[in-house]
Amino acid sequence: MGKRESYEAKTTELIQPVVEANGVELFDVDYVKEGSDWYLRVYIDKEGGVTIDDCQNVSRAFNEILDRENYIDDQYIFEVSSPGLTRPLKKEKDYEKSIGRMIEIKLFSPVDKSKEYSGVLKEYDKDTVTISIDDVTKTFDRSNLAMIRWAFVDEV
């Protein structure tokens, strides 16, 4: 396990009780380098969406743990936020919650001469994802998915 994965795993282990105590769920943890800066990002979610107060409460509580445990060698910036309107689908529960939603898919290899699709998620299993595009059903191999996330739909 590399440094990045190790820090993400340790953060996940340590923050789980904090998010539960604050009435939210852990969506994801990322430890990434952008430019010359390292970022430890914790994404939280709850039914109806998270508030700034939710993020602030988790951040304050976990900062104390980060200071005490001191398991990250690099200097880093710690952030807590929502996964956003165009959240990625990473875990099985993300797929389950997304049935009937508009999603965007980017593929590693083109299917029917395209690498990008948008449609309503109809079903999924461990190997495939099926979406409906203008009443046409299309199934993709999950191994070919470079990215799958909620599509931003402006309902004005």
Swiss-Prot record:
GO terms for biological process: ribosomal small subunit assembly; translation. The keyword Cytoplasm applies. Pfam families: DUF150_C (PF17384), RimP_N (PF02576). GO terms for cellular component: cytosol. SUPFAM superfamilies: YhbC-like, C-terminal domain, YhbC-like, N-terminal domain. CDD domains: YlxS_C (cd01734). It is found in: Cytoplasm. Keywords: Cytoplasm, Ribosome biogenesis. It comes from the Bacteria. Belongs to the RimP family. Required for maturation of 30S ribosomal subunits. HAMAP family: RimP. This is Ribosome maturation factor RimP.
